[in-house]
A protein has these predicted regions:
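Short, polar N-cap/turn motifs at the start of nucleic acid-interacting alpha helices
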Residues: 142-151, 157, 259, 278-298
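Basic/aromatic-enriched alpha-helical hairpins
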Residues: 1-50, 65-67
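C-terminal secondary-structure termini that scaffold catalytic or DNA-interacting sites
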Residues: 152-156, 201-205, 218-222, 306-332
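DNA breakage-rejoining catalytic core of tyrosine-based enzymes
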Residues: 34, 75-76, 88-107, 166-167, ...
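Active-site/catalytic core of tyrosine-dependent DNA strand-transfer enzymes
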Residues: 184-257
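Basic, Lys/Arg- and aromatic-enriched nucleic-acid-binding interface segment
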Residues: 52, 56-58, 71, 75-76, ...
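Conserved tyrosine-mediated DNA breakage-rejoining catalytic core shared by Y-recombinases
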Residues: 129, 138-194, 198
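Catalytic-site neighborhood detector that most strongly recognizes the C-terminal catalytic loop/helix
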Residues: 95, 166, 178, 221-223, ...
Length: 332
């Protein structure tokens, strides 16, 4: 669970919680259902006050477990999570400036690709498809052969994706909303994937990737794991370096430097770009949202004021119709 974390982070998350003159030393997973009190939940909520949405996610998950146990008559008590309020939802509506977005796209297709092909393909994938990180990392070159292989991946390139002058698509079999999704493979991304595939055959440094079914196989330091796909931890250093190169490292309210560009912000940037060019309805469908309200709540989209417009004056067409009617009467 704490792979890649610093000792300081590990110590922080495993330390006992001193809350309201009581010390809570057990993690939530170690409680049995009947002994978890609302005070213990409040203590863990207090511990996660700097990452409120993390607490909300945990609380939602465990609340579902309690409800399931009650429905199946495994547990007869109350759901303790009903008695502890969650943190208010923070809807972050942000995107990259258009010029920065375009520069990143150009950078992915530049000479820099030859030196960091897999990472820049990941960056291009989020900017051209809006996929979430875990949807990108688990992609395969081809459809899995068995159900076991399918469960280990997020999706795959549909057959014929690399055929010249033909449309290509990416298939996600189990995205966040649990509905299968087929996304269009836009030409710049298609060309990068073809370029990446060729590189695997021509560059000895990455030829080991040919043994993997995944587009983005896992590597850790000097070790390679072709049977596994990459993850968010592997993107930490290259993301920071990319942000530094583009001057996108900014200081937050606590004086710490953070990345302005992340995979999540890349998804939001894609959604905003589609909304601006094709409308919110198309953007919502391209992002595989359940409805347009989700897109409006979490993405920078055209303002409602943009809907206040007049139709163009097309009297000429009306006059033509009237003239046609008069001529028709004369003929009759």
């Amino acid at each position: 669970l704490y792979e890649g974390c610093t000792d300081q982070t590990r110590k922080k998350h495993t330390a006992p919680i001193d809350y309201m003159n009581t010390v809570y030393s057990k993690p939530l997973k170690s409680y049995i259902a009947s002994e978890l009190t609302d005070d213990a939940i409040k203590a863990h909520k207090f511990k996660l006050k700097e990452t409120p949405q993390v607490y909300n996610t945990i609380a939602t998950l465990l609340s579902v477990v309690y409800n399931w146990a009650k429905m199946n008559k495994i547990y007869k008590g109350d759901n303790p999570f009903y008695f502890v309020k969650r943190y208010p939802k923070v809807r972050v509506k942000v995107k990259l400036p258009d010029d920065v977005r375009d520069k990143l796209k150009d950078y992915c297709e530049s000479k820099a690709f030859d030196y960091n092909a897999h990472f820049l393909t990941i960056v291009a994938t989020v900017l051209y498809t809006g996929f979430r990180g875990n949807e990108i990392y688990g992609l395969r070159w081809k459809e899995p052969r068995t159900e076991e292989e399918k469960k280990k991946c997020s999706g795959w390139l549909l057959s014929g994706w690399d055929t010249p002058n033909e449309k290509g698509h990416i298939f996600l079999w189990d995205p966040k909303n649990r509905k299968e999704f087929k996304a269009y493979l836009r030409t710049p991304l298609k060309n990068l994937l073809i370029r990446l595939r060729k590189k695997l055959y021509n560059d000895p440094k990455v030829s080991w990737c040919l043994d993997s079914d995944y587009i983005f196989p896992k590597s850790r330091w000097s070790a390679n794991y072709p049977e596994e796909h990459t993850d968010s931890y592997a993107q930490t250093f290259p993301l920071r370096k990319l942000n530094e190169e583009f001057g996108l490292r900014t200081e937050n309210s606590k004086g710490r430097l953070k990345n302005l560009f992340t995979i999540k912000i890349g998804r939001k940037t894609f959604g905003s770009e589609v909304a601006a060019e094709r409308g919110i309805e198309i953007a919502s469908r391209a992002l595989n949202h359940s409805d347009t309200q989700v897109t409006r709540d979490h993405y920078v989209v055209p303002e409602d004021s943009d809907l206040d417009f007049e139709f163009e004056n097309k009297k000429t067409n009306v006059e033509n119709i009237e003239t046609h009617r008069e001529k028709k009467k004369e003929i009759i």
